[in-house]
Protein backbone atom coordinates (compact mmCIF):
# COMPACT_ATOMS: atom_id res chain seq x y z
CA UNK A 1 0.00 0.00 0.00
CA UNK A 2 1.24 3.45 -0.88
CA UNK A 3 1.64 5.88 1.96
CA UNK A 4 -0.38 9.13 1.83
CA UNK A 5 2.97 10.87 1.97
CA UNK A 6 4.02 9.20 -1.34
CA UNK A 7 5.87 6.01 -2.31
CA UNK A 8 8.14 4.58 0.35
CA UNK A 9 11.51 2.88 -0.08
CA UNK A 10 9.73 -0.47 0.22
CA UNK A 11 7.47 0.48 -2.69
CA UNK A 12 10.47 1.37 -4.82
CA UNK A 13 12.14 -1.94 -3.94
CA UNK A 14 8.99 -3.91 -4.77
CA UNK A 15 8.59 -2.08 -8.09
CA UNK A 16 12.24 -2.74 -8.94
CA UNK A 17 11.75 -6.46 -8.27
CA UNK A 18 8.70 -6.57 -10.51
CA UNK A 19 10.51 -4.66 -13.26
CA UNK A 20 13.53 -7.00 -13.09
CA UNK A 21 11.23 -10.04 -13.25
CA UNK A 22 9.50 -8.66 -16.33
CA UNK A 23 12.86 -7.96 -17.97
CA UNK A 24 14.01 -11.51 -17.29
CA UNK A 25 10.83 -12.90 -18.79
CA UNK A 26 11.33 -10.81 -21.92
CA UNK A 27 15.11 -11.19 -22.35
CA UNK A 28 15.40 -14.88 -21.43
CA UNK A 29 13.61 -16.18 -24.55
CA UNK A 30 15.70 -13.84 -26.69
CA UNK A 31 18.93 -15.15 -25.13
CA UNK A 32 17.76 -18.74 -25.55
CA UNK A 33 17.00 -18.10 -29.21
CA UNK A 34 20.46 -16.57 -29.76
CA UNK A 35 22.18 -19.46 -28.00
CA UNK A 36 20.20 -21.96 -30.02
CA UNK A 37 21.23 -20.11 -33.16
CA UNK A 38 24.90 -20.33 -32.11
CA UNK A 39 24.70 -24.05 -31.39
CA UNK A 40 22.89 -24.83 -34.61
CA UNK A 41 25.08 -22.64 -36.81
CA UNK A 42 27.31 -24.72 -39.06
CA UNK A 43 30.99 -23.92 -39.25
CA UNK A 44 32.15 -23.49 -42.80
CA UNK A 45 35.56 -25.11 -43.42
CA UNK A 46 38.04 -22.78 -45.00
CA UNK A 47 37.18 -19.84 -42.77
CA UNK A 48 39.75 -19.37 -40.03
CA UNK A 49 37.14 -17.62 -37.90
CA UNK A 50 33.42 -17.26 -38.39
CA UNK A 51 31.03 -14.75 -36.86
CA UNK A 52 30.30 -17.24 -34.09
CA UNK A 53 32.78 -19.97 -35.07
CA UNK A 54 36.17 -21.05 -33.86
CA UNK A 55 39.34 -22.10 -35.69
CA UNK A 56 38.97 -25.48 -37.39
CA UNK A 57 41.53 -27.65 -35.61
CA UNK A 58 41.36 -30.26 -38.36
CA UNK A 59 42.64 -27.80 -40.94
CA UNK A 60 45.25 -26.62 -38.45
CA UNK A 61 46.42 -30.23 -38.24
CA UNK A 62 46.67 -30.44 -42.03
CA UNK A 63 48.75 -27.27 -42.11
CA UNK A 64 51.09 -28.64 -39.42
CA UNK A 65 51.48 -31.84 -41.43
CA UNK A 66 52.39 -29.87 -44.54
CA UNK A 67 54.89 -27.80 -42.56
CA UNK A 68 56.58 -31.04 -41.46
CA UNK A 69 56.58 -32.33 -45.04
CA UNK A 70 58.04 -29.03 -46.22
CA UNK A 71 60.89 -29.43 -43.73
CA UNK A 72 61.70 -32.85 -45.18
CA UNK A 73 61.80 -31.55 -48.74
CA UNK A 74 63.81 -28.54 -47.61
CA UNK A 75 66.39 -30.92 -46.15
CA UNK A 76 66.55 -32.91 -49.39
CA UNK A 77 66.90 -29.79 -51.52
CA UNK A 78 69.59 -28.43 -49.21
CA UNK A 79 71.56 -31.68 -49.44
CA UNK A 80 71.25 -31.58 -53.23
CA UNK A 81 72.60 -28.02 -53.36
CA UNK A 82 75.49 -28.94 -51.06
CA UNK A 83 76.45 -31.89 -53.26
CA UNK A 84 76.22 -29.64 -56.29
CA UNK A 85 78.50 -27.02 -54.73
CA UNK A 86 81.24 -29.41 -53.60
CA UNK A 87 81.46 -31.52 -56.74
CA UNK A 88 83.96 -30.38 -59.37
CA UNK A 89 81.40 -31.04 -62.11
CA UNK A 90 77.63 -31.33 -61.84
CA UNK A 91 76.22 -33.56 -63.09
CA UNK A 92 79.36 -35.72 -63.01
CA UNK A 93 80.99 -36.57 -66.31
CA UNK A 94 79.33 -39.47 -68.09
CA UNK A 95 75.86 -38.67 -66.76
CA UNK A 96 73.23 -38.90 -69.53
CA UNK A 97 71.66 -35.54 -70.30
CA UNK A 98 68.12 -35.18 -69.02
CA UNK A 99 65.46 -34.50 -71.62
CA UNK A 100 63.31 -31.44 -70.93
CA UNK A 101 60.33 -32.07 -73.22
CA UNK A 102 58.57 -34.78 -71.22
CA UNK A 103 59.26 -33.26 -67.77
CA UNK A 104 58.18 -29.87 -69.15
CA UNK A 105 54.87 -31.26 -70.42
CA UNK A 106 54.45 -33.10 -67.13
CA UNK A 107 55.01 -29.83 -65.26
CA UNK A 108 52.31 -28.07 -67.29
CA UNK A 109 49.89 -30.91 -66.59
CA UNK A 110 50.53 -30.95 -62.85
CA UNK A 111 50.40 -27.18 -62.41
CA UNK A 112 47.24 -26.92 -64.51
CA UNK A 113 45.61 -29.61 -62.38
CA UNK A 114 45.69 -27.25 -59.40
CA UNK A 115 43.49 -24.76 -61.25
CA UNK A 116 41.17 -27.56 -62.33
CA UNK A 117 40.92 -28.81 -58.77
CA UNK A 118 40.06 -25.34 -57.49
CA UNK A 119 37.05 -25.35 -59.80
CA UNK A 120 35.86 -28.43 -57.95
CA UNK A 121 36.08 -26.67 -54.61
CA UNK A 122 34.27 -23.64 -56.05
CA UNK A 123 31.54 -25.99 -57.28
CA UNK A 124 30.87 -27.54 -53.87
CA UNK A 125 30.78 -24.08 -52.32
CA UNK A 126 27.74 -23.59 -54.55
CA UNK A 127 26.31 -26.98 -53.52
CA UNK A 128 27.18 -28.34 -56.97
CA UNK A 129 28.15 -31.93 -56.18
CA UNK A 130 28.19 -32.92 -59.85
CA UNK A 131 30.66 -30.11 -60.56
CA UNK A 132 32.85 -31.30 -57.69
CA UNK A 133 32.91 -34.81 -59.12
CA UNK A 134 33.66 -33.59 -62.64
CA UNK A 135 36.57 -31.32 -61.75
CA UNK A 136 38.08 -33.66 -59.17
CA UNK A 137 37.78 -36.51 -61.66
CA UNK A 138 39.71 -34.49 -64.25
CA UNK A 139 42.33 -33.63 -61.62
CA UNK A 140 42.76 -37.32 -60.78
CA UNK A 141 43.22 -38.14 -64.47
CA UNK A 142 45.86 -35.41 -64.81
CA UNK A 143 47.68 -36.77 -61.75
CA UNK A 144 47.69 -40.26 -63.24
CA UNK A 145 49.07 -38.89 -66.52
CA UNK A 146 51.83 -37.11 -64.58
CA UNK A 147 52.84 -40.33 -62.82
CA UNK A 148 52.70 -42.28 -66.08
CA UNK A 149 55.00 -39.70 -67.68
CA UNK A 150 57.41 -39.98 -64.79
CA UNK A 151 57.49 -43.77 -65.04
CA UNK A 152 58.10 -43.50 -68.79
CA UNK A 153 61.04 -41.20 -68.09
CA UNK A 154 62.48 -43.65 -65.56
CA UNK A 155 62.34 -46.57 -67.99
CA UNK A 156 64.05 -44.61 -70.76
CA UNK A 157 66.83 -43.00 -68.71
CA UNK A 158 70.23 -44.50 -69.31
CA UNK A 159 71.21 -44.33 -65.66
CA UNK A 160 70.25 -46.14 -62.49
CA UNK A 161 69.99 -45.27 -58.83
CA UNK A 162 73.65 -46.14 -58.21
CA UNK A 163 75.17 -44.72 -61.41
CA UNK A 164 76.60 -41.71 -59.59
CA UNK A 165 75.69 -39.13 -56.96
CA UNK A 166 73.55 -37.08 -59.34
CA UNK A 167 71.55 -40.14 -60.36
CA UNK A 168 70.96 -41.05 -56.72
CA UNK A 169 69.76 -37.52 -55.95
CA UNK A 170 67.57 -37.50 -59.04
CA UNK A 171 65.76 -40.72 -58.20
CA UNK A 172 65.38 -39.90 -54.51
CA UNK A 173 63.94 -36.44 -55.14
CA UNK A 174 61.62 -37.34 -58.00
CA UNK A 175 60.64 -40.65 -56.44
CA UNK A 176 59.82 -39.10 -53.06
CA UNK A 177 57.76 -36.45 -54.81
CA UNK A 178 56.04 -39.15 -56.85
CA UNK A 179 54.98 -40.87 -53.62
CA UNK A 180 53.38 -37.61 -52.51
CA UNK A 181 51.55 -37.30 -55.82
CA UNK A 182 50.27 -40.85 -55.31
CA UNK A 183 49.05 -40.00 -51.82
CA UNK A 184 47.37 -36.88 -53.20
CA UNK A 185 45.62 -39.03 -55.79
CA UNK A 186 44.32 -41.28 -53.02
CA UNK A 187 42.90 -38.22 -51.25
CA UNK A 188 41.17 -37.09 -54.45
CA UNK A 189 39.74 -40.56 -55.07
CA UNK A 190 38.55 -40.65 -51.47
CA UNK A 191 36.68 -37.37 -52.02
CA UNK A 192 35.14 -38.74 -55.21
CA UNK A 193 34.04 -41.91 -53.44
CA UNK A 194 32.48 -40.04 -50.53
CA UNK A 195 30.77 -37.58 -52.85
CA UNK A 196 28.66 -40.48 -54.17
CA UNK A 197 26.66 -40.24 -50.95
CA UNK A 198 24.06 -37.46 -51.37
CA UNK A 199 24.69 -34.57 -49.03
CA UNK A 200 28.07 -35.78 -47.79
CA UNK A 201 29.68 -32.60 -49.10
CA UNK A 202 27.87 -29.28 -49.22
CA UNK A 203 28.46 -25.55 -49.11
CA UNK A 204 28.81 -25.69 -45.32
CA UNK A 205 30.53 -29.06 -44.95
CA UNK A 206 33.46 -29.86 -47.22
CA UNK A 207 36.57 -30.19 -45.07
CA UNK A 208 37.78 -33.23 -47.04
CA UNK A 209 37.61 -31.24 -50.26
CA UNK A 210 39.66 -28.36 -48.86
CA UNK A 211 42.24 -30.67 -47.26
CA UNK A 212 42.77 -32.57 -50.52
CA UNK A 213 43.09 -29.34 -52.49
CA UNK A 214 45.58 -27.84 -50.04
CA UNK A 215 47.72 -30.99 -50.18
CA UNK A 216 47.62 -31.01 -53.98
CA UNK A 217 48.75 -27.38 -54.15
CA UNK A 218 51.63 -28.30 -51.84
CA UNK A 219 52.68 -31.12 -54.18
CA UNK A 220 52.61 -28.70 -57.11
CA UNK A 221 54.79 -26.11 -55.37
CA UNK A 222 57.33 -28.77 -54.43
CA UNK A 223 57.47 -29.96 -58.03
CA UNK A 224 58.14 -26.44 -59.33
CA UNK A 225 61.15 -26.11 -57.00
CA UNK A 226 62.34 -29.62 -57.88
CA UNK A 227 62.01 -29.03 -61.62
CA UNK A 228 64.05 -25.83 -61.44
CA UNK A 229 66.81 -27.37 -59.30
CA UNK A 230 67.19 -30.70 -61.07
CA UNK A 231 66.24 -30.03 -64.68
CA UNK A 232 67.02 -26.37 -65.31
CA UNK A 233 70.02 -25.43 -63.14
UniProtKB/Swiss-Prot annotation:
Belongs to the cytochrome c oxidase subunit 3 family. One of its GO terms (biological process) is aerobic electron transport chain. GO terms for cellular component: plasma membrane. It comes from the Bacteria. The gene is ctaE. It comes from Synechocystis sp. (strain ATCC 27184 / PCC 6803 / Kazusa). Its EC number is 7.1.1.9. It is found in: Cell membrane. GO terms for molecular function: cytochrome-c oxidase activity. The chain crosses the membrane at residues 62-82, 98-118, 135-155, 172-192. Coiled coil: none annotated. It is a multi-pass membrane protein. This is Cytochrome c oxidase subunit 3. Keywords: Cell membrane, Membrane, Translocase, Transmembrane, Transmembrane helix. It catalyses: 4 Fe(II)-[cytochrome c] + O2 + 8 H(+)(in) = 4 Fe(III)-[cytochrome c] + 2 H2O + 4 H(+)(out).
Amino acid sequence: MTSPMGPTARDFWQNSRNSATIQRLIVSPMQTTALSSDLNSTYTPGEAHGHHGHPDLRMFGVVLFLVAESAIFLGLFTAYLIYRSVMPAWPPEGTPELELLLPGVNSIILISSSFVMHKGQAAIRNNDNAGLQKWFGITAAMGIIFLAGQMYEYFHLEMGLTTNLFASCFYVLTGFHGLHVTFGLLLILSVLWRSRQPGHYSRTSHFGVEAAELYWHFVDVVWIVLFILVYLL
